[in-house]
């Protein structure tokens, strides 16, 4: 059974299609992470990074070192930076940009637009699809109208949306995003309450999503959901 676990902040662990995947793996500096970095040692198939801010790039370099068979999925420009600065070999990269699906051993991957900032590459969201389940991780983003197209093209079952405000959408804006994305199952809030700067009440998101006829699922750090 495919499974999703929230690791706090924007970090998400997926077990999907026989693959162990982590998205935006800030572990060491994540005050609410339920796991230590050694949990992932020799235990990952794929790392996905939406953009290079420290709270998303996180422990990617170290995770690539302690998982010598793992691959990295990110934009070409971000991967080029990591290859140049940290000697991550290109043969372990899956370079991409915003566009259509890429096959990774039976798992389908894609990058989407995000409205945010990033030093070494444009910011993105990520699509992961396998075992009949499609997940959209929005990365860091404000609200943008092309979310309608993301919903139309990829038809996500689950959407993971930042709701902390200040640097991303707030609960109200994220609920509007849900209405545009039209998830078949649940909208899951991320990127909130890690620090005081992004402190919000996730129940505000739940209420706004419900008003629009969709379902939100609030996970605690370390909590899983079967997909």
Curated annotation (Swiss-Prot):
Classification via InterPro entries: Metallo-B-lactamas, RibonucZ/Hydroxyglut_hydro, UPF0173, UPF0173_UPF0282_UlaG_hydrolase
UniProt entry tagged with the keyword Electron transport: no
Molecular function (Gene Ontology), one example: hydrolase activity
Superkingdom in the source lineage: Archaea
Transmembrane parts of this sequence: none
Keyword set, alphabetical order: Hydrolase
Keyword Hydrolase in annotation: yes
Family membership: Belongs to the UPF0173 family.
PANTHER family associated with the record: UPF0173 METAL-DEPENDENT HYDROLASE MJ1163 (PTHR43546:SF3), UPF0173 METAL-DEPENDENT HYDROLASE MJ1163-RELATED (PTHR43546)
Protein's UniProt name: UPF0173 metal-dependent hydrolase STK_14180
Organism: Sulfurisphaera tokodaii (strain DSM 16993 / JCM 10545 / NBRC 100140 / 7) (Sulfolobus tokodaii)
Classification lineage: Archaea, Thermoproteota, Thermoprotei, Sulfolobales, Sulfolobaceae
């Amino acid at each position: 059974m495919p499974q999703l676990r929230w690791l706090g902040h924007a970090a998400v662990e997926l077990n999907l299609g026989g693959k162990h995947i982590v998205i935006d793996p800030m572990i060491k500096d994540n005050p609410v992470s339920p796991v230590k970095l050694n949990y992932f040692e020799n235990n990952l198939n794929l790392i996905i990074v939406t953009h290079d801010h420290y709270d998303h790039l996180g422990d990617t370099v170290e995770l690539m070192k302690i998982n010598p068979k793992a691959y990295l999925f990110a934009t070409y420009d971000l991967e080029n930076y990591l290859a140049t600065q940290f000697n991550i070999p290109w043969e372990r990269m899956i370079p991409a940009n915003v566009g259509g699906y890429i096959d990774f051993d039976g798992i389908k991957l894609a990058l989407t637009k995000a409205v945010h900032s990033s030093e070494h590459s444009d910011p993105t969201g990520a699509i992961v699809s396998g075992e009949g389940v499609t997940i959209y991780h929005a990365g860091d983003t404000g609200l943008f109208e092309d979310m309608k197209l993301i919903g139309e093209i990829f038809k996500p079952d689950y959407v993971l949306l930042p709701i902390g405000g200040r640097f991303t959408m707030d609960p109200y804006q994220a609920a509007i995003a849900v209405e545009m994305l039209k998830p078949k199952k649940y909208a899951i809030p991320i990127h909130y309450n890690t620090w005081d700067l992004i402190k919000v009440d996730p129940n505000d998101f739940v209420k706004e999503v419900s008003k629009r006829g969709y379902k939100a699922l609030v996970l605690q750090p370390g909590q899983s959901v079967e997909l």
